[in-house]
Amino acid sequence: MTIVFRLAGALMAKGGAVQYRVDPKSGNRISALGLGCMRFPGAPGRPDVKTADAIISRAVEQGINYLDTAYLYPGNEVCVGASLERLGLRDRVLLATKLPHASCKCVEDFDRFFDEQLRRLRTDHIDYYLMHNITSPAQWERVVALGIEDWIARQKAAGRIRMIGFSYHGSAADFLTMLDAYEWDFCQIQYNYAGERYQAGTAGLLAAAERGLAVFVMEPLLGGRLAGKLPPRASVVLDGANDPHLRTPAAWGLSWVWNHPQVTMLLSGMTDTAQVDENAALADRALPDSMTATQLDAIARVLTEFEKSNRVPCTGCGYCMPCPRGINIPGCFAAYNASYAHSWFTGLSQYFTASAVRTSEAKLVSNCVKCGKCARHCPQHIDIPERLDDVRRRFQPGPVTAVLKAFCKTRS
C-alpha cells in the first residue's frame, strides 16, 4: 500500500502542506500530482516557452516534483529541458521521459535515442525512464532480443537511469504478462472512473501494487472529457451533490483516482497556472480511501450518463495526426460525441468548425481513403477509419456536405 504523508518547509503549497506518496521501490517521495508536459500550449512541435516556464515554476512552488515528457512529443523534451535550466529547478524535480522503442532496430539505437534525450533535457540522468506506449508483450520481446535488458543494466549502473518502467495501452491480460516480463520499478497506466475495465483497469492497478511497483496514472480525466465535457445529465448529478470540497467535474474525477491507495501519482496535463493551483489544492485534500459512500454513488450515476454518450473513446491525444488527407480526427470524434452528449446541432457546429472553419478547403471525413496510418498509432486501439464512417453518416447527409464545401469555396 502506498504511504502518504505531508512535508512542511520549502515545498509548502499555498494554503497548506503538500501530499506526497512513496515509491515503494526507491523510497522517493513523489507528489501525488505530477505535471504532464505533453499538453503545453503552443503551435504543433513548438510549445510556448513563456507559458511552459510559468507552469513549471508554479508547479514546483506548489510542491509538484514529477515532470513527464517523451521523445515522441514534438518539441517537448527540448522545451522542458530549457525551462528547467533557465529556472534552475532540475535538482528539485524527478524527470521522466520515454524511449521510442518501435524505432529501435539495434542495440546502438538505444544509446542514440537516450543520448539525444539527455542533450534535449540538458541533464546527465533520467529519474524515471519508460518504454513508451507498450500495447503487447511482443513489443517488449522484440527489444529484449536486441539486448535491452543488458543495456538497462549498464545505464542503471552508470547512474544515467534511476528507475525503469513502461507506459501501457494494451489489454488487461497482456498487462499481467508485462508485469512479470522484467524486474520493473514502476508502470504507468490509463485510469479513470470511466475506465475501470479498460486496458489495465482496476485489476491491473491492484496487480501492479501487489508486486510492489509504483503506479503512475495518465488520462485521469480522459483527455478532459471527464472535466468540462460531461453530458448535461451527468453535470446535473454533480451539481445536485453540492459537495463543498468537489466543486468541479475535474475535482470529482481526480479525487476518484487519488482515492485508490494503490495509486502513487497521477499526471495532469495542466495548460495554465490557474489549473496548477486548482489541482494542487485538490491534491492536498484527496487522501486514499477518503471518498464517502455518497460521493462514490454520485460518481456511479455520472458514469451511467457518460457511457450513454461516449460513442468513441478518443482522448484527443493527437497520436493519429497528421492525417494524410487533412482530416482533423480528434476534432471530428469530439464533435460526434458532443452530438450525443448534448444535441445533434451542437455536434454539427463542432464538426463544421473542425472540418471547414479552420481550413482553406473542406477536410471532410468522407475524404478518408482508409489507409490505416492513424489506427496504427492510436493508444486506445480505435478502428479510426470505421469510426470516421460513423461520423460521416451522422454529419454528412447531402445538404450538409454541400454547405461545408460551399463555405470553403467562398473563402478561397
Task: Report the location of each language-model feature.
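N-terminal binding-site loop/beta-alpha segment at the start of enzyme catalytic domains
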Residues: 2-93
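Conserved, mostly hydrophobic/aromatic
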Residues: 23, 35, 67, 80, ...
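Conserved residues at the C-terminal ends of beta-strands
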Residues: 36, 70-73, 129-132, 167, ...
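Glycine/proline-rich, positively charged
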Residues: 43-44, 57, 61, 104-221, ...
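Structured C-terminal cap/extension of enzyme domains
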Residues: 64-65, 84, 183, 203-412
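Short catalytic-loop micro-motif centered on adjacent basic/acidic residues
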Residues: 65-71, 162-166, 188-189, 265-267, ...
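Alpha-helix-loop-beta-strand connector modules within alpha/beta enzyme cores
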Residues: 78-97, 149-158, 210
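A short, structured active-site edge motif that brings together acidic residues
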Residues: 91-103, 129-132
